[in-house]
Structure formats: structure tokens, C-alpha cells
């Protein structure tokens, strides 16, 4: 029945078109919107030898792309699972991604880099264009652009003047308000202010306290000033604030015997809160020969994450992590603006990031009784004195200060019409350097009673881990591309490029290290902990080979983009729970290959109809990866060669149908309709490939009625109420999933004056 419904929904535009062959095509451009250049690094993406997707305001609004997570699957081979909290935004692109290490996809908003995945999830409003570049973009963008980049550009007061207001209501207590004002004082000066408020009651109930486990409130605002100082010189200043407060991590226990996932059921607080402030200044000087740009930005965020790390009604242990970041970034770039065959660009970038993390872990009553006390009981069974823990809570405070500095020089040259008309070659090189330092301090104390014969002696064991570690990395990131254009409508290309994701320190390991050190206290035979080896992880590298074809026919009513890619990834960073269960470690997983294809079709069918087809296939497997796995009381070596990389889907499919109809002398001016079919899977949840999410599909839709300056939208998400999982992990031998959000629906009223 679901398949039949999907077929009907997707064939709707063609059915209506067949019935209305005589209707006048009154919309000349309703689907393939104009794409503009806002990046100072790139020219028109549609003319570049790269796999890319550009989303305009009509598409962003019609497809209900309200945050970066909504880009998932809409773009070929891009998957951003919606789970956890605003902190846990993990992009997977072409089979590449990581839950806890640095991002594999870089994010820029108005040319400002976002350094931490903790800041990726925020509400979209007044967005004028989104660009997604797939494949390593290290030459121009450097670190952490191993899988690709996302560029987001907000609306300019030179593009729109007036007031925008919208209010939304929906099921599950959804309430959203957005308002903005744009003004152009004169031909040279414009300014704008905008803001939003968004609340949802939540979708899942915590069985322990019968409260919603994932209610969320977010709010924010933006101010922008743009000044054309002279015809050649312009400046832009942007201030942006975002706030989020939510219940989080609605993970439910998985029952392998029935294949079902229970509702969340935990006793400790699971929540996340974040405040983020961005300031940026763009200076741009342009002549008929060059464009010189300076981009200066500062990002501050402060967050507070509370997590019941056993996710059960018992009191095992909990984490309260608070972060504060100060990040400065400066980039100066110059590129040619002539019409000659030779085009070039040079750039210099540097950044400084301070990240202070306070992450105390609390071992609670059940954790002490069921985990720590048995360690002493086993020792007593072998003849050691009988030890009884008297604490009901053991706190392990942790303070970590991370300072990272980096810099890079880059160059890219393109020579067009090389030897023959239509043949061009692009070559680029980037020298990237980075140094990171970690100051850490953590300690713990455990009170016990030691029984020796008839005597009971109270005693305490305590230990401290305190010190400094540093890492530094340097990389050379080359790129070569060859392109041949038959005419201005079609071209083919071959690209070879290198990608790089930086290494770093995994501070989540310290609770496990501290517990081990405490248990070994007083044992001279115990192996001394090597902190540097335990917490450091190395960079991840990739070589990407790609062949592609792009075309635009029928007056740009049909656009195609086909690509085949092969990625050879070394030292892939993967996240694993340590054998004790009370910490996560990042390992470099040997070698991985990811190969696949991407197909994008954009069509303007006429009569107001449009259809996009976006398909991605990624076959990402381990070529060389062995790991130590604890089985009972023994540790075994397991070879994962040939297994699929977990968490990344093998297939993504999006069919996006649009329809717009104008009315003459009617109560409404025009009607719009949008339908999206989204298919995702198969996804393996662990390196052993023992659990998986089969291919699943969801359907979204929106209908809009427009009269003068007013628009009424009726919308729905996951209209088939598909039951699927978005995230999986293990803790203390238990398996947990987070389910996908159920059917959502609502109404939005928009006013534009």
C-alpha cells in the first residue's frame, strides 16, 4: 500500500499535466532558479569540474529545508542523521564521517568557518543560497573538508527591501515565529535585522518520569550592514546569535529477541543548552582585473550537556560537559577577474581557537555496587584483603583546555582552451600547518573499609592525572582537474584531489583512564598509563579520483550531473566505546575505500511543473582494520576487512516534484505544491556489520496558497509515518537506538510587505 501511495504522489505532476495540455505556460521560470556567485573563492559552480548542488530560496522553502539536518538525502550521498541533540550533528558524505572526531565536512556561513560540529545545528531563516561541494576541497578550504563543504549565504538588504513575518503551528506542540526587516537607505548602504523563535514539545516520552524526552526551544537573531563605499570597494558586517535549550538523547533499549526498540527509560537528566555568537567583517576590493577579499570572523559559543550515560533507570554514571569556545579566523584571498584564458587565485589563512571543557563524570550508587565493588571482590577471592566501598557517589572532575593554531597558503590556477578550444586544466596546491596543545587535570578519591581479621580499617585511595600534551600536523594538499567542454551546454571532467581531517585529543577517554589508575593505586606491578598514547589520534587522509559530466539542454530546462568517484582513505577516524563502557575512544581504522556514483537531474517540465532526481551510491568498506574486542573476560582480535563502514548509508535517493499554477481574476493569485520522496539505506550500525537499518523511505509535502502579500502553507513530514532508526550505540552490553521522528503536520502563515 505504501509503494502504491508513493507512486501516486510522484506521478501527480505528470497526471495533471496530461489533463491540462492546453493550459498556457504562464511561468517562464518556476523551477530552475537563477544561481548567483557569493563565494570569493569560487566562480560559477555549474562551470567547475566538481560535484556540486546549489539550492535557491524557492527550493529551500518548498522542500522544507529548515536546518542543516534537512539537507540529508536531499543532496546525493549526503547523510546527516537527526539524533541526540543539537550538539550531535554528524555529516556523512560519500561514506565518510565520524561521530566524535573533527568533522569530515566543513561548514561556512557567509564565508565564516564553523570550527565545531557542536555549532552546526541551527535554524535556517532568510537564506538566499546553499552550496554543497562533494569530494575533498582541501586546496581552497583546507582542514576538515575531506568529504566536502557546505556554504550557506543569508539574504542581503540589496536583494530585498521590506518586512517578512511568518508564524507556524503544528502537532507535537510546534510553535514557530520568524520576523525580519530589510532596508536600503540609499544606493550604497543597506541594513537588516531578523529573528526567530521555535519550540516543539517533543516526540518521545521518558517512561521513567513520563515527561517528553526531546522537547526543544531555540531562538536567535541576525543584524547585517552592507556598505558600497566606492564602486570598487564594499564592506559587510554581520552579527548573529543562536540559542538552544532542549531535553536530549531519547535513546531506547533494543531487544534483539523481538527486534523492537523501547521508549526511553532513564532516571538522570539528559539535556543540552547552547548560546552562540558570530561576528564577521568582509572587505572586498574589485577592479576589472582582480578581486581582493579579507574575511575576519570571531565565533563564541558556550554549551552545557548533561547525559545519563547508562540510559537506564539505574544510577550507574552520568556526565555533565560544559564547553566554552573562542575562535578567530582571518583569510585574505586574491583572484583574477579578467576574461583571459588564464585564471588564478592566491590565499593566506590563519586561525586561533581556544576551547575550555569542564567534563565531570559521576559514578553513582549502582555503578559503584555493580562495577567498582566487584573489582575488589575478585581481588579478595584471590587472597587480597576484603575491601568495601563506602562512597555512594564517586566524582571524577575533569578540566581540559585546548588551544589550536593553524595557518595555510594556497594557490589555484586554471588555463582555459589549452591546445584546443574547450579543454582546460586546473591545478592547485595548499600548504597547511596546525598545532594543538592540551592542558588536562582530573582526579578522584575513593573511600573504603578494609577488613583484616576482626579489624575494620577505614582508608582512602586517591589519584591525579595532570599534565600537558601537544600535537602538530603539516600537510600538502594538491588538486588537478582536466575539463573538456563541447560547448556552453555540456562538459566532462576528471579530478584528482587530496583531503585531510586533522587529528587531536579525545578527552572522553579520561574517565576510563582515571578509573584504571585508581584501581591500580598501590599496585607496583601495574602497567603505567601512557596518557599521550591513550588520548591522541592521528589525521585522516584521502585521495579522491572523480570523473563527471554536466549538461544543460532545452534552454536550461533540463540539467544533468553525473559522476563516478573512488576515495582511498587512510587512518580513518572511528569512535568506539572502551571495554569498560564508561568512555569513548577514537581509533585510526587502517584503510578504507569508498567508491560510488551520483546522479542529479533537474527538469522544468513546463505547465508549471518541475522534477528533481538526486541519487547517490557509496560503497565504503574496510580494506585493512583489526581491533581488540572484549568477549567475556578475554580480549580477541577481530578482522573487519571487507565490512562496510558503519553509520553511512549505501544509497540515498530524493525525488522532488514541484508545481505552480497562476490564476487570473481569482480569489488567490497562485498555488504551489511540493512533494519529496526520500529513500535511505542500507546502514550498518557497527564494524562487525551485525546490525543494520534496511532501506527505508519517507514522504514530505507542502501546499501553498498565495494572495497578494499573504501565503498560507499546509505541510507535512514523514507522511507515511515510517518507522526507522537514526542512531545506534552500545553501553554496558546493552544496545540502544534512537527512532526517527513520526508524522508531523502543520500550517504556516507568511506575510511579506
PLM regions with names:
Residues 282-307, 491-497, 508, 514-588, ...:
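Membrane-embedded beta-barrel scaffold of Gram-negative outer-membrane proteins
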Residues 345, 500, 608-611, 666, ...:
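C-terminal beta-signal and adjacent terminal beta-strands/loops
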Residues 69-110:
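Extracytoplasmic beta-strand/coil segments of soluble accessory domains associated
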Residues 110-136:
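Short acidic/polar hinge/loop motifs at secondary-structure boundaries
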Amino acid at each position: 500500500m505504501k509503494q502504491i501511495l508513493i507512486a501516486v504522489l510522484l506521478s501527480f505532476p505528470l497526471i495533471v499535466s496530461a489533463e491540462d495540455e492546453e493550459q498556457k505556460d504562464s511561468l517562464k521560470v518556476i523551477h530552475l532558479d537563477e544561481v548567483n556567485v557569493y563565494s570569493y573563492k569560487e566562480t560559477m559552480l555549474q562551470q567547475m569540474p566538481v560535484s556540486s548542488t546549489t539550492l535557491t530560496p524557492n527550493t529551500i522553502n518548498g522542500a522544507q529545508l529548515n536546518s542543516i539536518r534537512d539537507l540529508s538525502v536531499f543532496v546525493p550521498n549526503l547523510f546527516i542523521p537527526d539524533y541526540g541533540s543539537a550538539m550531535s550533528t554528524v555529516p556523512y558524505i560519500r561514506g565518510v564521517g565520524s561521530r566524535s572526531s573533527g568533522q569530515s565536512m566543513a561548514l561556512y556561513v557567509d564565508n565564516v568557518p564553523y570550527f565545531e560540529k557542536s555549532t552546526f545545528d541551527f535554524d535556517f531563516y532568510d537564506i538566499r543560497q546553499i552550496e554543497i561541494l562533494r569530494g575533498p576541497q582541501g586546496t581552497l578550504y583546507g582542514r576538515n573538508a575531506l568529504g566536502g563543504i557546505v556554504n550557506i549565504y543569508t539574504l542581503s538588504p540589496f536583494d530585498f527591501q521590506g518586512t517578512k513575518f511568518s508564524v507556524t503551528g503544528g502537532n507535537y506542540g510546534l510553535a514557530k515565529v520568524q520576523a525580519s526587516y530589510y532596508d536600503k537607505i540609499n544606493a550604497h548602504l543597506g541594513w537588516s535585522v531578523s529573528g526567530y523563535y521555535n519550540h516543539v514539545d517533543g516526540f518521545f516520552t521518558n517512561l521513567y518520569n513520563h515527561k517528553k524526552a526531546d522537547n526543544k526551544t531555540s531562538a536567535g537573531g541576525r543584524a547585517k550592514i552592507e556598505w558600497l563605499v566606492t564602486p570598487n570597494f564594499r564592506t559587510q558586517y554581520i552579527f548573529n546569535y543562536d540559542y538552544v535549550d532542549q531535553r536530549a538523547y531519547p535513546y531506547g533499549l533494543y531487544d534483539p529477541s523481538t527486534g523492537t526498540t523501547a521508549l526511553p527509560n532513564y532516571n538522570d537528566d539528559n539535556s543540552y543548552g547552547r548560546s552562540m555568537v558570530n561576528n564577521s567583517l568582509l572587505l572586498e576590493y574589485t577592479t576589472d582585473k582582480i578581486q581582493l577579499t579579507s574575511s575576519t570572523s570571531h565565533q563564541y559559543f558556550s554549551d552545557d550537556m548533561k547525559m545519563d550515560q547508562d540510559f537506564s533507570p539505574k544510577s550507574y554514571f552520568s556526565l555533565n560537559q560544559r564547553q566554552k569556545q573562542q575562535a578567530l579566523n582571518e583569510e585574505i584571498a586574491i583572484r583574477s577577474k579578467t576574461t583571459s584564458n588564464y585564471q588564478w587565485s592566491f590565499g593566506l589563512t590563519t586561525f586561533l581557537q581556544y576551547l575550555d571543557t569542564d567534563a565531570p563524570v559521576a559514578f553513582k550508587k549502582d555503578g559503584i555496587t555493580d562495577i567498582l565493588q566487584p573489582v575488589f571482590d575478585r581481588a579478595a577471592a584471590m587472597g587480597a584483603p576484603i575491601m568495601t566501598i563506602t562512597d555512594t557517589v564517586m566524582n571524577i572532575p575533569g578540566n581540559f583546555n585546548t588551544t589550536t593554531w593553524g595557518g595555510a597558503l594556497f594557490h589555484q590556477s586554471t588555463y582555459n582552451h589549452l591546445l584546443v578550444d574547450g579543454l582546460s586544466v586546473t591545478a592547485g596546491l595548499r600548504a597547511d600547518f596546525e598545532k594543538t596543545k592540551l592542558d588536562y587535570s582530573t582526579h578522584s578519591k575513593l573511600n573504603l573499609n578494609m577488613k583484616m581479621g576482626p579489624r575494620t580499617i577505614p582508608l582512602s585511595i586517591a589519584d591525579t592525572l595532570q599534565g600537558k600534551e601537544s600535537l602538530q600536523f603539516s600537510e600538502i594538499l594538491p588538486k588537478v582537474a582536466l575539463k573538456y567542454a563541447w560547448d556552453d551546454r555540456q562538459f566532462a571532467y576528471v579530478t584528482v584531489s587530496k583531503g585531510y581531517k586533522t587529528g587531536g585529543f579525545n578527552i572522553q577517554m579520561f574517565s576510563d583512564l582515571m578509573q584504571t589508575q585508581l584501581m591500580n593505586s598501590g599496585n607496583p606491578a601495574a602497567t603505567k598509563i601512557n596518557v599521550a598514547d591513550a588520548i591522541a589520534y592521528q589525521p585522516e587522509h584521502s585521495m579522491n579520483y572523480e570523473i563527471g559530466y554536466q549538461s544543460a539542454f532545452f534552454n536550461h530546462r533540463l540539467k544533468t550531473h553525473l559522476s563516478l568517484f573512488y576515495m582511498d582513505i587512510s587512518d580513518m577516524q572511528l569512535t568506539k566505546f572502551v571495554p569498560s563502557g564508561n568512555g569513548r575512544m577514537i581509533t585510526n581504522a587502517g584503510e578504507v575505500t569508498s567508491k560510488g556514483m551520483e546522479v542529479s537531474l533537474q527538469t522544468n517540465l513546463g505547465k508549471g511543473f518541475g522534477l528533481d532526481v538526486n541519487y547517490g551510491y557509496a560503497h565504503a568498506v574496510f580494506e585493512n582494520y583489526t581491533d581488540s574486542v572484549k568477549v567475556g573476560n578475554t580480549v580477541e582480535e577481530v578482522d573487519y576487512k571487507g565490512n562496510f563502514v558503519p553509520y553511512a548509508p549505501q544509497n540515498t535517493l530524493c525525488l522532488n516534484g514541484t508545481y505552480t499554477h497562476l490564476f487570473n481574476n481569482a480569489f488567490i493569485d497562485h498555488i504551489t505544491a511540493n512533494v519529496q520522496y526520500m529513500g535511505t539505506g542500507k546502514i550498518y550500525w557497527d564494524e562487525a556489520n551485525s546490525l543494520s537499518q534496511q532501506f527505508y523511505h519517507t514522504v514530505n509535502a507542502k501546499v501553498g496558497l498565495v494572495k497578494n502579500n499573504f501565503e498560507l502553507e499546509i505541510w507535512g513530514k514523514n507522511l507515511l509515518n515510517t518507522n526507522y532508526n537514526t542512531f545506534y550505540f552500545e553501553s554496558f552490553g546493552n544496545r540502544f537506538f534512537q527512532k526517527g521522528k513520526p508524522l508531523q503536520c502543520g500550517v504556516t502563515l507568511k506575510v511579506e510587505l
